[in-house]
A protein has these predicted regions:
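Glycine-rich, phosphate-binding/catalytic loops in enzymes
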Residues: 22-27, 110-113, 147, 182-183
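Feature marks short, surface-exposed loop/turn motifs that line or immediately flank catalytic pockets
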Residues: 13-15, 101, 170-172
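Short aromatic-enriched loop/helix-cap "lid" or pocket-rim segments at secondary-structure transitions
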Residues: 18-22, 105-109, 177-179, 204-205
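N-terminal Rossmann-like NAD(P)+-binding domain of SDR-like oxidoreductases, especially those catalyzing
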Residues: 1-98, 229, 236-237, 250-251, ...
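A conserved pocket-lining segment of Rossmann-fold NAD(P)-dependent short-chain dehydrogenase/reductase
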Residues: 50-68, 92-107, 117-141, 165-167
Length: 262
């Protein structure tokens, strides 16, 4: 069987915290936040030279800096596929997806992300548990836009041999996300910020999408569309699993969710 093209499903996790910028010392790639830093509620990253709080840059394709086993495995998949594609003459592209959301996102996978967790919690009367201080930012992209990105690089020869970010390029804080969920559902949704954090979480993860835009792609749907489409799909499924508290308890028991000190 002749292989016409390979598209590798990668992740923005390959960037770790990505590149930061210090007003005095310029750009740098930070190390992960230490347990001691997180326990003291020092959520933001600091310059490695002067220890001043630094500003996150958009995640650009050239600044990979994976920390955990998932991120390392994704970057290894990319390099393996792109390298073998070059050697064997098989057109290959890697797509680094941001947090992909929308209809048919699993209602049962405890690790399927903020959309399922917040929406399911709100619809079942549970508070939305927000880690750290809620000001950490993420990049959310609609599944329809991800599909369109895959189709574009599948048909565009200029994409071959490259890695591309697929996201919205828009910073959304977790608190902003929670407020939008409350606005959409229309009931008295409660937030809870208990001063806890998840081990291994990045502080900010927002992708630059300029490279893929150069091929003619751009996202057509925003976060409001994501939640509308997800809520409409949930109504069609006819039920919400009552497993949110079990997932939260499981993560606490496993040492994934930890409490910071006041």
């Amino acid at each position: 069987m002749k292989i016409c093209k390979v598209i590798v499903a990668s992740s923005q996790a390959v960037y770790g915290e990505g590149q930061y910028f210090c007003q005095e010392h310029g750009p740098f790639l930070p190390v992960p936040r230490s347990p001691q830093q997180l326990q003291r509620k020092l959520w933001e990253l600091s310059c490695c030279k002067c220890d001043r709080v630094a500003n996150p840059s958009l995640l650009a394709e050239q600044h990979t800096n994976p920390y955990n086993q998932y991120a390392v495995s994704k970057l290894a998949q990319e390099k393996t596929a792109l390298g073998l594609g070059w050697i064997h003459g098989i057109p290959t592209v890697a797509l680094r997806y941001s947090i992909t959301q929308g209809p048919r996102q699993s209602l049962f996978n405890h690790y399927s992300g903020i959309c399922r967790i917040f929406v399911s919690s709100a619809l079942t009367g549970s508070p939305l548990v927000i880690y750290e201080d809620g000001l950490q930012t993420r990049d959310f992209v609609h599944i329809d836009d991800v599909v369109n990105a895959n189709m574009l690089v599948l048909e565009n020869d200029a994409a071959e041999g490259h890695a591309f970010n697929v996201g919205s390029g828009i910073r959304t804080s977790v608190v902003e996300y929670a407020r939008l969920v409350r606005d959409k559902i229309g009931n008295q949704v409660e937030f809870r910020i208990p001063g806890e954090y998840r081990t291994g979480d990045n502080r900010h993860s927002v992708s630059s999408i300029s490279k893929l835009k150069g091929l003619g792609w751009s996202p057509k749907k925003n976060l409001s569309d994501i939640l509308d489409d997800f809520l409409n799909w949930i109504q069609q499924t006819g039920g919400i699993p009552h497993q949110i508290r079990d997932a939260y308890s499981h993560m606490k028991e496993a040492g994934v969710v930890l409490a910071a000190f006041d």
